[in-house]
């Protein structure tokens, strides 16, 4: 059951190296603490190899790239591969600019990535060289819906097999595949889109799940997606008059903090294809 995955995070307290963006860095740190992990942030090229060496996994997020941070990503990634640590790539805004797209593609080509997690437009850009990324958000034209679900499942399965990485596409319907099995997940609330950084938070948390569950990375990735979506549902259910997106953000983090195996197993909404 997926609940075992979050219990393993709480037992092992995995230290995660995050090279993430400055928009959401604090929220990424807090959700890692909430799920039972431990965060450390560093993008400086002269620092990252030492930091990666003391951690269990690496979360690479390209949301606010600089020449220095790009160098740091490759240095940290090579060190993580050397140590056989899981690496997650979050290709934020791939398709929105040449720099983002090229950086994400080069990271895919030069590093062994455990998971690639993004919205459908970002993933389509990496897989097909096309996609209609709207800033850092997925375009509605790319959305995974009940009508397009079978096609989307086939797409994510094929890209996972081709890339050699688990691929997680998050949106109204989430898909997580290793090239063979595909989890179709229906947790979450549309209001989560009114909070910046829920995807970045998920990437950080998912990396902790990967570290703590080394024998089943696919299930760990799916469990992280269900945890985040279920936290969104729980947080929304606790809203009060006058609450806005800032309060909702905190309620999501609180819901992750209080999540246990039983709550996750009862609330996770998924099927495996």
Specify the residue positions occupied by each region the protein language model found.
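Conserved N-terminal subdomain of the carbohydrate kinase-like
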Residues: 2-89
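Glycine/small-residue-rich loop that forms an oxyanion/phosphate-binding "nest" at active or ligand-binding sites
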Residues: 69-118
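Short, well-structured alpha-helical segments that form the helix of a local strand-helix-strand
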Residues: 155-160, 217-232, 252-253
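Short pre-catalytic strand/loop immediately N-terminal to key active-site residues, enriched for Gly-Thr
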Residues: 185-196
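Short, small-residue alpha-helix embedded
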Residues: 194-226
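Charged C-terminal helix
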Residues: 230-273
């Amino acid at each position: 059951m997926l609940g075992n995955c979050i219990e393993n995070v709480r037992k092992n307290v995995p230290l995660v190296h995050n090279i993430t963006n400055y928009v959401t860095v604090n929220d990424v740190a807090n959700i890692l603490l909430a799920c039972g992990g431990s965060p450390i942030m560093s993008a400086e090229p002269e620092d990252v190899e030492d930091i990666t060496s003391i951690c269990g996994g690496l979360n690479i997020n390209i949301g606010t790239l600089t020449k220095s941070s790009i160098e740091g990503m490759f240095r940290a990634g090579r060190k993580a591969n050397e140590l056989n640590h899981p690496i997650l790539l979050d290709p934020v805004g791939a398709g929105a600019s040449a720099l983002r797209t090229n950086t994400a593609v080069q990271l895919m080509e030069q590093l062994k990535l455990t998971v690639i997690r993004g919205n459908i437009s970002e993933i389509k850009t990496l897989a097909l060289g096309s996609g209609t990324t709207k800033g850092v958000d997925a375009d509605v034209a790319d959305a995974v819906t009940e009508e397009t679900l079978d096609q989307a499942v086939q797409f994510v399965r094929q890209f996972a097999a081709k890339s050699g990485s688990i691929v997680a596409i998050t949106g109204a319907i989430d898909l997580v595949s290793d090239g063979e099995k595909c989890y179709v997940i229906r947790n979450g609330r549309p209001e989560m889109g009114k909070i910046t950084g829920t995807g970045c938070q998920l990437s950080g948390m998912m990396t902790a799940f990967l570290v703590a569950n080394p024998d089943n990375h696919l299930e760990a990735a799916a469990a992280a997606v269900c945890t985040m979506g279920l936290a969104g549902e729980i947080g929304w259910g606790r809203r009060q008059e006058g609450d806005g997106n800032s309060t909702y953000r905190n309620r999501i983090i609180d819901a992750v903090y209080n999540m246990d195996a039983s709550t996750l197993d009862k609330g996770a909404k998924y099927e495996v294809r």
